Amino acid sequence: MPNRVDIAAFQKVMIVYNRNSGKQLFASMLARVNEVKKRLKQVIDPKSLEIVEIKSFEQVEGLAARICQEKYDWIIVAGGDGTLRAIIDVFAKHEHMPYVSVFPAGTVNLVAKELLMSNDPAKCVKRVSKGIVSPVQLGKANGHIFLTVAGIGFDSLVVDNVS
């Protein structure tokens, strides 16, 4: 995998946002997602950009499979760790996997924090527009992909109750 990619050459780019991600107000998240979209249109061909809202994890499987089948180049996931994990879980089952960026819009956003991704639209687009690639090693437990840590018992109870 190269250390940098030329995002201007990407023909198919999608922003996927989960309107139910995190415990924040949807209007606030949507405003930030729209700002990312506006700024991205300044660095890539606007015709190559699609924005898709998901409302549940049930919608993720079909959308992520479509992304792979239609060979999207780059996906920006605006959501939390759960949204990102659900999408990557489907991607890992397909031959084609697009480049993935995360725009933190969930409760904790541990993956975004580990990758030093900002939730400020200007900073996010500035960073991703440089095309810097940060490979992430996927883990797998009980047939499911995980990106940072896997927890059971009390640990998972604590994560479910994070505010």
Which positions does each model-derived feature cover?
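Short amphipathic alpha-helical surface micro-motifs
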Residues: A31-E35, T83-L84, D120-A122, S129-G131
